[in-house]
Swiss-Prot record:
InterPro entries per UniProt: ClpS, ClpS_core, Ribosomal_bL12_C/ClpS-like
SUPFAM superfamilies the UniProt entry points to: ClpS-like (SSF54736)
Similarity remark: Belongs to the ClpS family.
Organism: Desulfatibacillum aliphaticivorans
Any single biological process term in GO: proteolysis
Known partners and oligomeric status: Binds to the N-terminal domain of the chaperone ClpA.
Lineage of origin: Bacteria, Pseudomonadati, Thermodesulfobacteriota, Desulfobacteria, Desulfobacterales
Protein name: ATP-dependent Clp protease adapter protein ClpS
Signal peptide: none
Listed Pfam families: ClpS
Length: 104
């Protein structure tokens, strides 16, 4: 007699385990220019990057003094969306503020 396929043999079937890799992260950079106001940059950092006023001010001063500053670190898709949002806001207000991303 063949074994009943419905009989519980105590074996547990498991799915092969797959390691989930962390997504590659990217720094979103703000670039200094001679026209975009400091107040506008602080506002962008607050609205787009959810920074507090002190943190936004610190980042803005880095951008102003060093020419570039890190607004945040995100996955590629999130970074691209934030860059597009910054560029849209800057264009709407007549500022040439530039934003870019680079691998962390």
């Amino acid at each position: 007699m063949s074994p009943d396929p419905h009989e519980d043999l105590g074996d547990v079937l498991t799915e092969p385990t797959q390691k989930t890799e962390r997504p590659r992260m990217f720094k979103v950079l703000l670039h200094n220019d001679d026209y975009t106001t400091m107040e506008f940059v602080v506002g962008v950092l607050q609205r787009v990057f959810n920074k507090s006023v002190p943190e936004a001010t610190r980042i803005m001063l880095n951008v102003h003094n060093r020419g570039v500053g890190v607004a945040g670190v995100y996955t590629a898709e999130v970074a691209e969306t934030k860059i597009e949002t910054v560029h849209s806001m800057a264009q709407a207000d007549g500022f040439p503020l530039k934003c870019s991303m680079e691998p962390e």
